[in-house]
Amino acid sequence: MIRIENISKQLSHRILFIEASAALNRGEKIGLVGPNGAGKTSLFRMIIGHELPDEGQVSVDKGVSIGYFSQDVGEMSGRSAVAEVMDGAGPVSEVAAELRELEAAMVDPDRMDEMDAIIERYGEVQARYEELDGYALDGRAREVLAGLSFSEAMMDGDVGALSGGWKMRVALARILLMRPDVMLLDEPSNHLDLESLIWLEQFLKGYEGALLMTSHDREFMNRIVNKIIEIDAGQLNSYSGDYVFYEGQRALNEKHQQSQFERQQAMLAKEIKFIERFKARASHASQVQSRVKKLEKIDRVEPPKRRQVVAFEFQPAPRSGEDVVAVKNVSKRYGDKVIYDGFDFMVRRRERWCIMGINGAGKSTLLKLVAGDSKPDEGTVSIGASVKMGYFAQHAMDVLDGEMTIFEMLETTFPRAGQAPLRALAGCFGFSGDDIDKRVRVLSGGEKARLVMAIMLFDPPNLLVLDEPTNHLDLDTKEMLIKALSQFEGTMLFVSHDRHFLAALSNRVLEITPEGVFQYGGGYTEYVERTGHEAPGLRS
């Protein structure tokens, strides 16, 4: 369906692809992976013709329809979310638009002399609309939006009043309703709550077309794809299997290549040693010459070019008291909406609570109450003895000094740390080389989030309160964070929609539902086993 043949591509001074090739065949569901900046979005744009390769070609079979979802959703306003979604439904939306025009023409007194032709055309268009299942389009659009957690009021309200994250969902719904032959989805899991994520996962698993997608959510990708295309050192490497298979195969390939490299280096060293030893002796001249020629003809094995992710290690945090957080008889409301009413909750040392709940259940509110960013209407929230808190929330990016560079920000925050540890810290969170000289104001939201996280974790607290800490982190950086936090000896209270993160780090679950608040003594994996669902909104 789509062939990428020997493409080379350079952006400014950065080489993205060097004679790279890959293919997307009918029915394949492919995960596109690679570090930030490797060229994933550029590859999508070349497939849809918005960019061209410098060399080589990208070809799409004739008649193949493509739906492309990107993070740049453009302007939306002046109509409902349902209308916006239906408008992107491919041919059926165009047929629907013509039907509406013909219906208006049929009641237009100025066009009475054209009526026979209008009625004849209306019959043709109506038949085509029925053939495309157009009368079910509104229902299908609402079904998709409901899957992405839209309420009826949000579906019918002005799309322009929605936040950026909800507009992203509208843009995604347009592509899903379109059901093209090929879907290109660039980070579809961004901005989704866990319930929406699981619904999208089921939708894509049942989708009969071909799929090429990127995602920073390991579990989401692993459950959908049957092939991985990896961008590595300008090449496109294909692996048949899911993401877990790819991880294992990649590690084996690297190990094999490293072994080959080391064996060849040992052989080369032996040959060079012989040449150096006997090159001055006439009696060994022919042997030396023979070995020199042999070395010249050998194809050199390169060491693995894998980008190494630096491990982050916590400095020892001061020990807190046994009772870390005590929430007693707390009530909290926003306007008429009651979030908590007589709520009690205790967090003890070394517990790792993940907070579960649908949108608006009060997850972030609880973290704000614990962090002191919000006050209860009634009751008390007490922090225990010797507790040193680190609080990560999305608004934390707003307090960064835009005129400072990344390194200046780290130096100002930790004036006694020294350059080497701070550079190592920056590297752990994806800022290497010249990146540390970027001014904060030019950083993306994801880069700012990583900088805030780095500052918070360098001088470690003994209580971490984390609101969606994995947003914007790529797969490698997220894995580094999981490994680091698994070694953290303090207490954690966190919200995340990343199931891999939840399963790896939690040992307690607090589930907030309309029926009440439920506590589970095991981690997320045990919660799923006990309840039979992966998210509170999926309760039967």
Where are these regions (language model features)?
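Short intracellular "coupling" helices and adjacent cytoplasmic loop segments at the cytosolic face
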Residues: 108-109, 274-286, 300-303, 430
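Extended non-transmembrane interhelical loops and adjacent amphipathic helices
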Residues: 119, 192, 289-299
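Short, flexible active-site-proximal loops enriched in glycine and acidic residues
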Residues: 153, 266, 304-306
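ABC ATP-binding cassette signature C-motif
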Residues: 1-261, 308, 315-540
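Short amphipathic coiled-coil heptad-repeat segments
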Residues: 142-148, 273-277, 293-301
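ABC ATPase nucleotide-binding domains
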Residues: 257-279, 284-293, 308-309, 529-540
